[in-house]
């Protein structure tokens, strides 16, 4: 089941970010990997923190008013192709079909030579709010992400397991040239 209304309510009213405590996927760490001429598509941008860190960024998020486009990635249409995408906890919900569609759509907005930076919840209902028990977390593993990478002609690198002191997440990068 993929209930976008439930997810939107959860992220608007119950979720609290703690992203900069991560080693590999903190905003400032990733921002340093993005060159000043590159365009970033931030999928599930939340409060859109890359706006103050990256020269050219478009944030997409269905739940948050701070997004440049307040829509799901499936409903987002761009007039340009992007050099880089970030999916920092945003494509974590639903089954193989839902996640596959979301990745297909995100990749369709990228240039042939591009990168994607990922932070993934490996299916754990470990958010601070009890409301997260109703969320259909996707059971991510580095192997599952690798399968999607290969499907889209990306090379997956820098696989890591990281924590922010409270939860464990997976990190990886995709590179395509």
Predicted features by range, described:
Residues 1-77, 115-177:
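Class I (Rossmann-like) S-adenosyl-L-methionine-dependent methyltransferase catalytic domain
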Residues 68, 99-100:
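Internal amphipathic alpha-helical segments of the cytochrome P450 catalytic fold
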Residues 86:
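A conserved beta-strand element that flanks and buttresses the S-adenosyl-L-methionine
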Residues 89-93:
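Short catalytic micro-motifs in class I SAM-dependent methyltransferases
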Residues 95-97:
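Short N-terminal helix/helix-N-cap motif within the alpha/beta-hydrolase-1
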Residues 100-112:
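A short glycine-rich, Lys/Arg-flanked "PGG" loop and its adjoining helix->strand segment in the class I
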